[in-house]
């Protein structure tokens, strides 16, 4: 089973989770902390303090989390005594974080717990809360002097969405800077914690096979797809205020674009890596209204079938305004105006209720100027070589090339050279939250967003949102279970007949045309 290694000995501390009675803590945070505990990567002197409005005792909170660990952890608990040892590190405090008097009581409790656990005044404050509290909680922490570092550390972790647009992101950054230094602030994007995302850097910069050809001379175009077969589930109210562009492209897909397109840093360090990603964002070609009309597609799913099961349309989902114009599908054609990538199109696509749930990057290489060999036409074959980087699921890399078909003549057939993480000696990759939580504990913010990166991404997205709001690009529809509206295929036709349609398994990806 996969194991991650820390960058050093983690100092004693208390991890405070605001919104601890919510879904994120139960499904991701606590199970990931258990996995770190099982690998003996947590310090012996360590505590978890859950904080939330829900009235719970510490014992009832622990009982909830025991069930969550059993259900969601990568490493299923087999030793009841070991699980009990972990649960004994967990505490709970019920209060309203918007109430200053209640927050004073909470601050007193935190300091008392710190003294009893001997955690040396070190705190990580994780905001697993609605975005409406992203300004309130850090302000309250500062009012009660829980932000000050005096030979110890105080860090704050903030989930996405970080802002609703450029203006709100800048306001939130300014508010945070008033109370926490940038090196105390950790803006989390779980995509950066995925092994396959980090492996893009190694694939590019550790292999002379790829880096010399990673440019406009050899690469024709790049596709980045994050498809979901699920609908909005129980997040209808949140999603209706967000949409696919804000929810996925502004953060996850632009991040993947940044890593694919960045220059090699002089050294692998937090500041250098993040500098290069910001440079990519700053070089994104701005979109005016005409560009938005020509280079973007937005759509909303209507009733259809997913793997033969009927599902409702978006407007029939719980919590969604029946008159909503929120997009559940978004596709962009964008350019990076720098020496390496000038005029190479990057196609970004995301959507809900698509045939399968897959995130992958496909780098398409240019065809040769002269075709010496006869190519066998296959309904799903693509001209040219391609590198498929599968982020999730069935993580791996696939290099698509042409070889000679056995027999007389020189007819070529498309084949693939594959690597899958499942082929390694361990059976499970560490979860993204395992890696990111451990990095934060070690004070390593390499895989967290910096303030200027967030603002640069919003600076690119804002004009698209504005044009969509004024209906410069129509809101289309697509049946659930399809790959989106026809206009999305029209968007990519300048580079290919259609998008690369991912399969649920890497080895049957696209050439086999199986979903």
From Swiss-Prot:
GO terms for biological process: glucose metabolic process; pentose-phosphate shunt, oxidative branch. Its EC number is 1.1.1.49. It holds the Pfam family G6PD_N. The active site is at residue 252. Keywords: Carbohydrate metabolism, Glucose metabolism, NADP, Oxidoreductase. NADP(+) binds at residues 53, 160. It catalyses: D-glucose 6-phosphate + NADP(+) = 6-phospho-D-glucono-1,5-lactone + NADPH + H(+). It comes from the Bacteria. InterPro entries: G6P_DH, G6P_DH_AS, G6P_DH_C, G6P_DH_NAD-bd, NAD(P)-bd_dom_sf. GO terms for cellular component: cytosol. SUPFAM superfamilies: Glyceraldehyde-3-phosphate dehydrogenase-like, C-terminal domain, NAD(P)-binding Rossmann-fold domains. Gene3D superfamilies: Dihydrodipicolinate Reductase, domain 2, NAD(P)-binding Rossmann-like Domain. It is an enzyme of class 1 (oxidoreductase). Substrate binds at residues 190, 194, 228, 247, 352. Pathway: Carbohydrate degradation; pentose phosphate pathway; D-ribulose 5-phosphate from D-glucose 6-phosphate (oxidative stage): step 1/3. GO terms for molecular function: glucose-6-phosphate dehydrogenase activity; NADP binding. Catalyzes the oxidation of glucose 6-phosphate to 6-phosphogluconolactone. Belongs to the glucose-6-phosphate dehydrogenase family. This is Glucose-6-phosphate 1-dehydrogenase. It comes from Treponema pallidum (strain Nichols).
């Amino acid at each position: 089973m996969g194991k991650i290694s820390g960058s050093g000995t983690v100092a004693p501390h208390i991890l405070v989770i605001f919104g601890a009675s919510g879904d994120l803590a139960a499904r991701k945070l606590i199970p990931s902390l258990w996995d770190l505990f099982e690998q003996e990567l947590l310090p012996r002197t360590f505590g978890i303090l859950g904080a939330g409005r829900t009235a719970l005792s510490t014992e009832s909170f622990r009982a909830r989390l025991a069930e969550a660990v059993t259900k969601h952890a990568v490493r299923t608990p087999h030793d009841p005594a070991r699980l009990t040892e972990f649960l004994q590190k967990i505490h709970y405090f019920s209060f309203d974080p918007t109430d200053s008097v209640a927050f004073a009581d909470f601050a007193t409790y935190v300091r008392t717990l710190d003294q009893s656990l001997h955690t040396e005044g070190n705190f990580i404050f994780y905001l697993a809360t609605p975005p409406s509290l992203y300004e309130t909680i850090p302000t309250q922490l500062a009012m009660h002097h829980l932000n000050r570092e005096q030979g110890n550390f105080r860090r704050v972790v903030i989930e996405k969405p970080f802002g609703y647009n450029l203006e709100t992101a800048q306001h939130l950054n300014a508010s945070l800077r008033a109370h926490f230094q940038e090196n105390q602030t950790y803006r989390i994007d779980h995509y950066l914690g995925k092994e396959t995302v980090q492996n893009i850097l190694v694939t590019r910069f550790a292999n002379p096979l790829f880096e010399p050809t990673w440019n406009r001379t050899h690469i024709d175009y790049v596709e980045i797809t994050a498809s979901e077969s699920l609908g909005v589930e129980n997040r209808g109210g949140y999603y209706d205020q967000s949409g696919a562009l804000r929810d996925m492209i502004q953060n996850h897909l632009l991040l993947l674009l940044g890593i694919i397109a960045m220059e090699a840093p002089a050294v692998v360090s937090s500041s250098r890596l993040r500098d290069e990603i910001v440079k990519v964002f700053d070089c994104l070609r701005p979109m005016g209204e005409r560009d938005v009309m020509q280079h973007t597609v937005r759509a909303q799913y209507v009733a259809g079938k997913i793997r033969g099961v009927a599902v409702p349309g978006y407007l029939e989902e719980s919590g969604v305004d029946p008159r909503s114009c929120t997009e559940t599908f978004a596709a962009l054609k964008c350019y990076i105006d720098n020496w390496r990538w000038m005029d190479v199109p990057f196609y970004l696509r995301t959507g809900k209720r698509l045939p399968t749930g897959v995130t992958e990057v496909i780098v398409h290489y240019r065809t040769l100027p002269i075709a010496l060999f006869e190519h066998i036409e296959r309904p799903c074959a693509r001209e040219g070589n391609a590198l498929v980087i599968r982020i999730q699921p069935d993580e791996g890399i696939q290099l698509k090339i042409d070889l000679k078909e056995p027999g007389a003549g020189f007819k070529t057939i498309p084949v693939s050279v594959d690597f899958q993480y499942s082929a390694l000696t361990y059976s499970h990759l560490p979860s993204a939250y395992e890696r990111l939580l451990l990095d934060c504990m070690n004070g390593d913010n390499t895989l967290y967003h910096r303030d200027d990166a967030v603002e640069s991404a919003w600076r690119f997205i804002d004009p698209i949102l504005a044009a969509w709001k004024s209906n410069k690009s129509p809101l289309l529809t697509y049946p659930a279970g399809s790959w989106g509206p026809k206009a999305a295929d029209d968007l990519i036709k300048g580079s290919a007949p259609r998008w690369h349609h991912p399969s649920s398994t890497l080895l049957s990806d696209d050439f086999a045309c199986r979903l």
